[in-house]
Every structure is written in structure tokens, then in C-alpha cells.
């Protein structure tokens, strides 16, 4: 009789065994259980505090009556609306269960052992998970130093130097999460133009809607010029649909074809498809939410700086604060006040905290609790 296997998890491949799982922001329900609090605000996961468009909510309510049916696996209706809005062909769009899903699809389709993917230090935590799971090699380039014009942001020169014949993907979030920092459009476009043809540039634009007036790119407008560019966006942030998980990639049609070969069937729910299609049409709702976030970004940052807290430049709906050696203690103190923010020690930034911009009232409550 063969010996009994006491830990079947050890059967997993080595590159998965060595992974650290993604840790999301602390849920409200968890804090309720732990501290017995009821008046809680969550400023941890960069969600839209105004929620989804009323049109999206109504569309999703109607779609609930169809949940006994599989969704349209091609997502044709949503892709058609996206194609019209973005000025691209339907065949250039791939839908995902959030843009995280699309990051994983890119890795599955274009990486394998012996190949490399590049991303910057302090880049989004899903990049290493997606890369390492394929057995490919992650090449992490140093970020800008703390005293630079865009501290802790992407160093494009370092990323360019890291490209080799084995490189297949360069991941760049602009603006970056968790830092909020960004690369101006001219510098980023020059970088993309210099990337060799055997390398895909995965341009993560999850916070695209919040970047107006700061000189960032509209990556979709570059696709005709750069066939190796893949632009990723989401309905989770400005559109307020984080809970139903809908994202999309826009790329050359041949890249979309490869992504669809590894995409799981029916990866976006019938409720998500309906909500996203309706949300896309309610431009006033998105514009109003973005306007508040951008205004609050400036107000909250100025207040914090005036009170002695260093804040990184941000083009997203969040701010990265330098909280010092007591960052964990300050996070815990905020929890006791019923405010959830995001520690980023797992990014190698143990002295920082990331704070989502909520409603003005929520932000005032945070600022009051933050005062020493």
C-alpha cells in the first residue's frame, strides 16, 4: 500500500507553491465582526463611493431574471458599445472578469518557462502572481528614488534596459497602483515606440477616467501605431461596478484572438454584462463621480501636506501617504475609529498607507481621525 499523502498541496508545481496570494482590502463585514462597530467607512480598495449609475442598477435588476441562462459568451452587446465609444473594431476587444482576469489571460497566452516579463518595483500586486504562475521569470526594475520628481514611480529607462530577447511582456500601470504616480504621455509614447516588436506592452489604465488635465495618455488612441500595445481598463473604479467584475482589453485583433483562446467560457456574468453596458451610456454619472474625486484629491492632499503628512503625487482616486515607522499603529487606530485604509507593506512600503478618496463627508472623517 503506498504511503498516505498528508499534504496534497505539495503536489502543486513549484512556481505556484512559492506564490504569495493576493490580499484584498479589509472588508467592512470583517471589521464589524472584530470590533463590533457599525458606522464604518471603507477607504481601502479604490471603489467609487457614489456607486453604480441608476441606469446600471436597473439593468442589473432586470438581468437577475435571466440568471438561469448562461450569459452571451462573446459579450457581443457590450463589446459593440465599447467599440463604438472607443472607435475600434469589435474584434479588438476582449472582456474579462475584471481587468485582473485579463492580466492573467495575457500571461497565460504569452508567457512560459524560459520567457520573461518586466514590471516596476511597487507595481500592482497581480503582475507577479500572473507571471510566476506561468513559470516565466519576473524581472523587477527599480522605481524612481524618493526624492525625484515622481517618487516611487516607474523608471522607464530602467525598464527599457531590462528588455532582452526573452522578454515577452512589459507591464505598465499609468497611473500606477498603489503609488498613484504617473508617466507623462510623451515619455511613455517614446518608450512604447522603442520597445522591440517581440514584446507586448500591457498598459494598465484602470484609473484612466481620473487622469484628465494631468498630461497622461489615452492608450487606445495609440493602438493603430503600435500593434504590440494592449490597453486594459475596468468598470470597477469610475463606473462603480467593482462587485460584478467587468474589465476589458483593447489590442490588435490577433492578440485578442489569442486571449480568447485561453479565456474561460462565460467569464463575465449576465448581470455584469448588463450593468456595464448600461453604465457605459450614463456619462453624466461617471463625470460627476470623477469630478468629486479629482476635487477631493487636491483638497485632501493639501490638507495632509499642511498638517505635516507627506503625500505622493496621484492621478488616481486615491492617495499614498507616508505614515512613518508607526504606519501599522496608525492603520490600527483608524480601524478603531471605523475607517478602513490600505497598508502597503506587502508592496515593500511598510511606512506608507494608501487611502481611497471617498465622499467629502467620508474624507473629512478620515482627516479628523488622522490628526495626531
Predicted regions span which residues?
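Short acidic capping loops at alpha-helix termini that bridge into adjacent secondary structure
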Residues: 39, 89-93, 113-116, 166, ...
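PLP-dependent aminotransferase-like
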Residues: 109-172
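N-terminal "arm"/small-domain region of PLP-dependent enzymes with the aminotransferase-like
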Residues: 2-69
Amino acid at each position: 500500500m503506498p504511503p498516505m499523502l498528508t499534504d496534497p498541496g505539495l503536489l502543486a508545481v513549484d512556481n505556484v507553491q512559492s506564490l504569495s496570494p493576493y490580499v484584498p482590502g479589509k472588508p467592512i463585514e470583517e471589521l464589524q465582526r472584530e470590533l463590533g462597530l457599525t458606522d464604518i467607512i471603507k477607504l481601502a480598495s479604490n471603489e467609487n463611493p457614489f456607486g453604480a449609475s441608476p441606469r446600471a442598477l436597473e439593468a442589473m435588476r432586470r438581468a437577475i431574471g435571466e440568471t438561469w441562462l448562461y450569459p452571451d459568451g462573446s459579450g457581443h452587446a457590450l463589446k459593440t458599445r465599447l467599440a463604438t465609444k472607443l472607435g475600434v473594431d469589435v474584434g479588438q476587444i476582449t472582456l474579462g472578469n475584471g481587468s485582473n482576469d485579463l492580466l492573467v489571460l495575457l500571461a497565460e497566452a504569452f508567457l512560459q518557462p524560459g520567457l520573461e516579463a518586466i514590471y516596476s518595483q511597487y507595481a500592482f500586486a497581480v503582475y507577479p502572481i500572473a507571471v510566476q504562475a506561468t513559470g516565466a521569470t519576473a524581472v523587477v526594475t527599480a522605481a524612481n528614488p524618493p526624492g525625484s520628481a515622481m517618487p516611487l514611480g516607474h523608471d522607464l529607462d530602467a525598464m527599457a534596459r531590462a528588455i532582452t530577447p526573452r522578454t515577452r511582456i512589459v507591464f505598465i500601470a499609468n497611473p500606477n497602483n498603489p503609488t498613484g504616480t504617473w508617466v507623462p504621455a510623451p515619455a511613455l509614447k517614446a518608450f512604447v515606440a522603442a520597445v522591440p516588436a517581440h514584446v507586448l506592452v500591457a498598459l494598465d489604465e484602470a484609473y484612466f477616467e481620473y487622469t484628465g488635465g494631468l498630461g497622461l495618455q489615452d492608450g487606445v488612441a495609440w493602438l493603430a501605431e503600435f500593434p504590440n500595445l494592449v490597453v486594459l481598463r475596468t468598470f470597477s473604479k469610475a463606473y462603480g461596478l467593482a462587485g460584478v467584475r467587468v474589465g476589458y482589453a483593447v489590442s490588435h485583433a490577433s492578440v485578442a484572438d489569442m486571449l480568447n483562446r485561453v479565456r474561460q467560457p462565460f467569464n463575465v456574468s449576465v448581470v455584469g454584462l448588463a450593468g456595464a453596458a448600461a453604465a457605459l451610456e450614463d456619462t453624466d454619472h461617471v463625470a460627476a463621480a470623477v469630478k468629486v474625486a479629482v476635487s477631493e484629491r487636491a483638497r485632501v492632499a493639501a490638507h495632509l501636506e499642511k498638517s505635516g503628512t507627506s503625500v505622493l503625487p496621484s492621478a488616481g482616486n486615491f492617495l499614498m501617504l507616508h505614515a512613518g515607522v508607526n504606519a501599522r499603529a496608525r492603520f490600527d487606530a483608524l480601524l478603531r475609529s471605523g475607517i478602513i485604509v490600505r497598508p502597503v507593506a506587502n508592496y515593500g512600503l511598510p511606512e506608507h498607507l494608501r487611502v481611497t478618496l471617498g465622499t467629502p463627508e467620508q474624507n473629512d472623517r478620515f482627516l479628523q481621525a488622522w490628526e495626531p
